[in-house]
Each structure stands twice: as C-alpha cells, then as structure tokens.
Regions:
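Glycine-enriched, solvent-exposed interface loops adjoining structured elements
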Residues: 1-224
C-alpha cells in the first residue's frame, strides 16, 4: 500500500504555505473521486459459498476500502442482476420468507450485500467490484497510486487551488487541473472497461519544478 502522505511533497511547491494535513486530506478526496468516476480500482473477490437461509454477506475487501459498485456477480455459474431496494420490495414483497436459487443482488452498504431469493443451499458466488478508499483511510493500493499518480495529483491540485482567500488560491489553475483530472479519469474508465481509449493526451504533469501557470488555452475540444 502507498500512503497519501508520500505524495504530499509533490503537491507542496504549487500550494505555498498549505499545511501537510490539508494536502493529504485533498489527496484522499481526489483519489476517492477518481475511483468513483473511473471504476478503475477493481478487485475480483475470492469465491465463497452461500449458506442456506442466509441472504446478507460481507464484501471481502482490503482494510481501508469500500465497494463503490458491484461490476459482476454470479451464483452457481449464472449471472445475477442488480436490483434497487424499491424494485426488490415491489417485485418480491415476500422474498424474506422464500428460499430458492438467487438471481438478483442488492448492494446494501459499502461493505455488505444481499442476494435474493434467500439461498436454499450452498453454492459458489463470484464477484468483481470497483473499490474506493474510505474517508478515514491513510493508504491506497500501490498499483493504483503508481498507475494513476498524475490523476491523483491533478485532482488534489484542482481542489486545493480553488480554496478561497489563501496564499495559494488560483482559480484559473484550478480549472485547468480539473480539466486534466477529467481527462485522466475518462482514460482510466475506458481502460478499466477494456475499451478504446480514444482520448488525446494533452499536457502531462511533470513533477516538482514546473511553474504554477504552465498551461495556455487548450484550444480544440477533446474528442471522447
């Protein structure tokens, strides 16, 4: 795991006088937003077997993370469909009283999910989920930190630079970093889906030593 604090030194030159703790807070927030938008932090959970009569299960995920979205779930080799709480109660009003072969799932919380109908036996469940850090986490998966370092830094900078009435406030630069962050998140989303990237890369973050106002006008719109 990589700590958010390890990235602080890469942000400080662009936000003079900003406390380390505030930088770390916004690095965490940027990482969460990136994971939500891109769904790039994917975990294939270890398969597990259902228990007869039990419909609620915990996601088996790393400490300091929570499930943003279930990407795939199968029961006994058959794909299951997601369902909303309202649809569950409307379409299966007595589901708690019946057992059978589960064919829908409901993400109840960031750490738990239901499968319906209530399992009548022990069958294998396989799930793939998109994760994100919790609001209290201090670390992020090293692969995500390394592969999407630019995105995380862009995201933290656009958040910090828009804070009003600070020595480092720069609304124009904030907007530019927000633009770059969106491009990185879109690229990561397409890559996670296995699709054609189709997004032209423009200016890349190059680390410490760049002047704060490093972009001119972007000119042409990016084609997605």
């Amino acid at each position: 795991m990589a700590s958010f604090s390890s990235l602080v030194k890469e942000i400080l030159p662009y936000v003079p006088m900003c406390p380390d703790s505030l930088v770390e807070q916004h690095l965490r927030a940027a990482t969460i937003e990136f994971c939500e938008r891109s769904k790039a932090y994917i975990l294939d959970m270890d398969p597990f077997n259902t228990i007869s009569g039990v419909y609620e299960y915990d996601f088996d995920i790393p400490v300091g993370t929570e499930v943003h979205q279930v990407l795939l779930m199968t029961h006994d080799g058959n794909d299951m469909d997601p369902i909303s709480p309202r649809s569950l109660e409307l379409n299966y009003p007595d589901w708690r009283d019946k057992t059978g072969q589960p064919h829908v799932y409901l993400q109840k919380t960031p750490t738990t999910f239901w499968i319906v109908p209530v399992p009548s036996g022990s069958k294998q469940v396989i799930a793939s989920v998109a994760l994100k850090p919790t609001r209290t986490s201090n670390n992020i998966d090293t692969t995500i930190s390394n592969q999407y370092r630019d995105a995380i830094i862009y995201g933290a900078l656009y958040r910090l630079l828009r804070i009003p009435n600070k020595e480092w406030t720069d609304i124009g630069a904030s907007q530019e970093y927000s633009f770059q962050f969106s491009i990185e998140a879109k690229q990561a989303e397409l890559r996670a889906r296995g699709g054609d990237l189709g997004v032209k890369r423009t200016v890349k973050y190059k680390g410490i030593g760049m002047p704060r106002r490093r972009y001119g006008r972007y000119g042409k719109e990016i084609d997605y």
